[in-house]
């Protein structure tokens, strides 16, 4: 039996703040997400979900928050380096913490990192065009 990745989720403190961030990032978060404790979004063949700590505690009451360093990195691909740079400027302009300003990792790959409202690192990536 082949193993397949089915879901990736983020446990959030405040659904309103999380939904707002991920919408600004470009994720098609449902319009009623703020009134929910768990929302699922189908993306690129898998399901991305946001779930409140309160909802998660029902399934895993002994779980405690991680501390220090990365808990998870979510990578979202943008089609151009200009789109990556613009998205980084947009998100940091709204007050989200820019963890790492846009930079070229290799001659063909560009990265930037922004922290979501819960401190999860979101990696933005794009291919760099060769002229």
Predicted regions span which residues?
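Vicinal oxygen chelate
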Residues: 1-6, 28-81, 85-115, 126-131
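Polyanion-binding surface elements
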Residues: 9
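Short glycine-/small-residue motifs
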Residues: 121-124
């Amino acid at each position: 039996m082949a193993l397949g990745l089915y879901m990736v989720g983020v446990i959030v403190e405040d659904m309103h703040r999380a939904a707002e961030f991920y919408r600004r990032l470009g994720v098609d978060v449902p319009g009623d997400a703020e009134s929910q404790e768990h929302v699922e979004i189908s993306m690129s063949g898998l399901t991305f979900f946001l779930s409140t700590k309160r909802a998660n505690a029902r399934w895993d009451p002994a779980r405690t928050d991680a501390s220090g360093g990365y808990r998870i990195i979510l990578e979202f691909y943008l089609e151009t380096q200009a789109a990556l740079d613009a998205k980084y400027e947009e998100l940091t302009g709204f007050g989200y913490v820019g963890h790492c300003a846009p930079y070229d990792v290799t001659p063909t790959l560009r990265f930037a990192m922004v922290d979501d409202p819960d401190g999860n690192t979101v990696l933005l990536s794009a291919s760099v065009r060769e002229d």
